Amino acid sequence: MDLTVIALTFAAIFVVELPDKTFLATLVLSTKYRPLFVWLGVGAAFAIQTLIAVAVGGVATLLPTSLIQVIAALLFLGGAVLLFIEGRRHHGTASEEDGSEFAEKAKDVRGFRQVLASFMVLFAAEWGDLSQLLSVSLVARYHEPVAVFIGAWAALLTVSGLAVLLGRTLLKFIKLHVLHYVGALVCLALGILTLVEVFA
Protein backbone atom coordinates (compact mmCIF):
# COMPACT_ATOMS: atom_id res chain seq x y z
CA MET A 1 0.00 0.00 0.00
CA ASP A 2 1.45 3.32 -1.15
CA LEU A 3 1.24 6.14 1.40
CA THR A 4 1.86 8.69 -1.35
CA VAL A 5 -1.28 7.54 -3.16
CA ILE A 6 -3.25 7.79 0.10
CA ALA A 7 -2.03 11.36 0.62
CA LEU A 8 -2.64 12.37 -3.00
CA THR A 9 -6.12 10.86 -2.98
CA PHE A 10 -6.96 12.55 0.31
CA ALA A 11 -5.83 15.94 -0.99
CA ALA A 12 -7.65 15.61 -4.33
CA ILE A 13 -10.95 14.40 -2.85
CA PHE A 14 -10.81 16.92 0.00
CA VAL A 15 -10.37 19.88 -2.35
CA VAL A 16 -13.10 18.63 -4.69
CA GLU A 17 -15.62 17.80 -1.96
CA LEU A 18 -15.26 20.85 0.30
CA PRO A 19 -17.25 23.11 -2.06
CA ASP A 20 -19.57 20.27 -3.11
CA LYS A 21 -23.22 19.66 -2.24
CA THR A 22 -22.01 16.97 0.16
CA PHE A 23 -20.67 19.62 2.51
CA LEU A 24 -23.87 21.65 2.33
CA ALA A 25 -26.08 18.58 2.78
CA THR A 26 -24.17 17.54 5.90
CA LEU A 27 -24.31 21.09 7.24
CA VAL A 28 -28.09 21.27 6.75
CA LEU A 29 -28.66 17.83 8.28
CA SER A 30 -26.59 18.74 11.34
CA THR A 31 -28.95 21.65 12.01
CA LYS A 32 -31.92 19.25 12.13
CA TYR A 33 -30.37 16.16 13.73
CA ARG A 34 -27.74 15.38 16.35
CA PRO A 35 -24.36 16.12 14.73
CA LEU A 36 -22.79 12.80 15.78
CA PHE A 37 -25.68 10.83 14.27
CA VAL A 38 -25.39 12.83 11.06
CA TRP A 39 -21.65 12.15 10.84
CA LEU A 40 -22.14 8.41 11.44
CA GLY A 41 -24.85 8.24 8.79
CA VAL A 42 -22.99 10.14 6.12
CA GLY A 43 -19.77 8.27 6.96
CA ALA A 44 -21.49 4.95 6.27
CA ALA A 45 -22.90 6.30 3.00
CA PHE A 46 -19.44 7.49 1.97
CA ALA A 47 -17.92 4.09 2.78
CA ILE A 48 -20.31 2.27 0.44
CA GLN A 49 -20.07 4.87 -2.32
CA THR A 50 -16.26 4.86 -2.16
CA LEU A 51 -16.16 1.05 -2.16
CA ILE A 52 -18.30 0.99 -5.31
CA ALA A 53 -16.07 3.57 -7.01
CA VAL A 54 -12.92 1.65 -6.10
CA ALA A 55 -14.46 -1.59 -7.40
CA VAL A 56 -15.30 0.06 -10.72
CA GLY A 57 -11.79 1.46 -10.90
CA GLY A 58 -10.40 -2.01 -10.16
CA VAL A 59 -12.36 -3.50 -13.06
CA ALA A 60 -11.09 -0.71 -15.29
CA THR A 61 -7.50 -1.78 -14.57
CA LEU A 62 -8.17 -4.97 -16.54
CA LEU A 63 -8.27 -2.88 -19.71
CA PRO A 64 -5.09 -2.07 -21.71
CA THR A 65 -2.87 0.38 -19.81
CA SER A 66 -2.90 3.10 -22.47
CA LEU A 67 -6.69 2.98 -22.70
CA ILE A 68 -7.01 3.19 -18.91
CA GLN A 69 -4.75 6.24 -18.83
CA VAL A 70 -6.73 7.99 -21.57
CA ILE A 71 -10.02 7.29 -19.77
CA ALA A 72 -8.56 8.49 -16.46
CA ALA A 73 -7.24 11.65 -18.11
CA LEU A 74 -10.64 12.36 -19.68
CA LEU A 75 -12.36 11.89 -16.31
CA PHE A 76 -9.89 14.26 -14.65
CA LEU A 77 -10.33 16.87 -17.38
CA GLY A 78 -14.10 16.43 -17.33
CA GLY A 79 -14.02 16.99 -13.58
CA ALA A 80 -12.01 20.18 -14.10
CA VAL A 81 -14.62 21.50 -16.53
CA LEU A 82 -17.51 20.64 -14.20
CA LEU A 83 -15.82 22.32 -11.24
CA PHE A 84 -15.05 25.42 -13.28
CA ILE A 85 -18.71 25.64 -14.35
CA GLU A 86 -19.83 25.22 -10.74
CA GLY A 87 -17.40 27.92 -9.68
CA ARG A 88 -18.91 30.33 -12.20
CA ARG A 89 -22.42 29.40 -11.05
CA HIS A 90 -21.62 29.99 -7.37
CA HIS A 91 -19.79 33.27 -7.96
CA GLY A 92 -21.62 35.96 -6.00
CA THR A 93 -24.42 33.67 -4.77
CA ALA A 94 -25.37 32.74 -1.23
CA SER A 95 -23.90 29.29 -0.62
CA GLU A 96 -26.45 28.13 1.92
CA GLU A 97 -29.30 28.53 -0.56
CA ASP A 98 -28.16 25.30 -2.21
CA GLY A 99 -28.87 23.38 0.98
CA SER A 100 -32.62 23.95 0.95
CA GLU A 101 -33.34 20.80 -1.06
CA PHE A 102 -31.64 18.66 1.58
CA ALA A 103 -33.62 20.28 4.37
CA GLU A 104 -36.80 19.24 2.59
CA LYS A 105 -35.60 15.64 2.20
CA ALA A 106 -34.62 15.28 5.86
CA LYS A 107 -37.47 13.55 7.67
CA ASP A 108 -38.50 14.51 11.19
CA VAL A 109 -37.10 11.50 13.09
CA ARG A 110 -35.52 10.99 16.48
CA GLY A 111 -32.85 8.86 18.08
CA PHE A 112 -30.71 6.46 16.09
CA ARG A 113 -33.07 6.71 13.12
CA GLN A 114 -31.35 10.01 12.40
CA VAL A 115 -28.31 7.97 11.37
CA LEU A 116 -30.39 6.10 8.80
CA ALA A 117 -32.06 9.29 7.57
CA SER A 118 -28.67 10.98 7.11
CA PHE A 119 -27.37 7.88 5.34
CA MET A 120 -30.28 7.87 2.88
CA VAL A 121 -30.03 11.58 2.05
CA LEU A 122 -26.26 11.49 1.47
CA PHE A 123 -26.27 8.17 -0.36
CA ALA A 124 -28.71 9.62 -2.90
CA ALA A 125 -26.86 12.94 -3.13
CA GLU A 126 -23.43 11.35 -3.59
CA TRP A 127 -24.43 8.85 -6.28
CA GLY A 128 -22.47 9.58 -9.45
CA ASP A 129 -20.77 12.50 -7.71
CA LEU A 130 -17.46 13.94 -8.88
CA SER A 131 -15.63 12.35 -5.93
CA GLN A 132 -16.77 8.93 -7.15
CA LEU A 133 -15.50 9.62 -10.67
CA LEU A 134 -12.25 10.93 -9.25
CA SER A 135 -11.83 7.78 -7.13
CA VAL A 136 -12.40 5.60 -10.20
CA SER A 137 -9.78 7.61 -12.09
CA LEU A 138 -7.23 7.40 -9.27
CA VAL A 139 -7.59 3.62 -8.98
CA ALA A 140 -7.25 3.28 -12.75
CA ARG A 141 -4.19 5.53 -12.75
CA TYR A 142 -2.27 4.15 -9.76
CA HIS A 143 -3.56 0.54 -9.46
CA GLU A 144 -3.79 1.00 -5.67
CA PRO A 145 -7.46 0.35 -4.76
CA VAL A 146 -6.89 0.01 -1.01
CA ALA A 147 -4.80 3.18 -0.83
CA VAL A 148 -7.37 5.12 -2.87
CA PHE A 149 -10.21 3.83 -0.68
CA ILE A 150 -8.43 4.88 2.52
CA GLY A 151 -7.49 8.31 1.17
CA ALA A 152 -10.91 9.01 -0.34
CA TRP A 153 -12.94 7.83 2.65
CA ALA A 154 -10.69 9.73 5.07
CA ALA A 155 -11.15 12.90 3.00
CA LEU A 156 -14.93 12.48 2.91
CA LEU A 157 -15.08 11.84 6.65
CA THR A 158 -12.95 14.94 7.24
CA VAL A 159 -15.12 17.14 5.01
CA SER A 160 -18.32 15.91 6.66
CA GLY A 161 -16.76 16.36 10.10
CA LEU A 162 -15.87 19.96 9.26
CA ALA A 163 -19.41 20.53 8.00
CA VAL A 164 -20.89 19.19 11.24
CA LEU A 165 -18.54 21.07 13.56
CA LEU A 166 -17.57 24.26 11.74
CA GLY A 167 -19.80 24.43 8.67
CA ARG A 168 -21.43 27.81 9.16
CA THR A 169 -18.21 29.41 10.36
CA LEU A 170 -16.25 28.13 7.36
CA LEU A 171 -18.86 29.41 4.92
CA LYS A 172 -18.40 32.91 6.34
CA PHE A 173 -14.68 32.96 5.54
CA ILE A 174 -14.33 30.64 2.54
CA LYS A 175 -15.96 31.39 -0.81
CA LEU A 176 -17.34 28.29 -2.52
CA HIS A 177 -16.49 29.52 -6.01
CA VAL A 178 -12.81 29.85 -5.02
CA LEU A 179 -12.78 26.25 -3.78
CA HIS A 180 -14.41 25.11 -7.02
CA TYR A 181 -11.65 26.81 -9.00
CA VAL A 182 -8.95 25.21 -6.82
CA GLY A 183 -10.55 21.80 -7.33
CA ALA A 184 -10.68 22.45 -11.08
CA LEU A 185 -6.95 23.21 -11.10
CA VAL A 186 -6.19 19.98 -9.20
CA CYS A 187 -8.21 17.91 -11.68
CA LEU A 188 -6.64 19.75 -14.61
CA ALA A 189 -3.14 19.04 -13.29
CA LEU A 190 -3.92 15.34 -12.79
CA GLY A 191 -5.41 15.14 -16.28
CA ILE A 192 -2.40 16.78 -17.92
CA LEU A 193 0.06 14.59 -15.98
CA THR A 194 -1.83 11.48 -17.05
CA LEU A 195 -1.84 12.55 -20.72
CA VAL A 196 1.89 13.29 -20.55
CA GLU A 197 2.45 9.71 -19.34
CA VAL A 198 0.34 8.37 -22.22
CA PHE A 199 2.29 10.17 -24.93
CA ALA A 200 5.73 10.12 -23.29
Label the model's feature ranges:
Residues 3, 34-103, 166-173, 182-185:
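Membrane helix-loop-helix hairpins that form the core translocation module of multi-pass transporters
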Residues 99-132, 138:
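Selected transmembrane alpha-helices and immediately adjacent juxtamembrane segments
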Residues 192-200:
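Juxtamembrane boundary at the C-terminal end of a transmembrane helix
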Residues 1-67, 134-154:
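Juxtamembrane transmembrane-helix termini in multi-pass membrane transport proteins
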Residues 88-92, 113, 117, 130-132, ...:
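Short, structured loop/turn "capping" segments at alpha-beta junctions
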Residues 23-24, 49-57, 121, 132-133, ...:
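Alpha-helical transmembrane segments and their lipid-water interface positions
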Residues 14, 18, 47-48, 81, ...:
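Hydrophobic/aromatic residues within the transmembrane alpha-helices of Major Facilitator Superfamily
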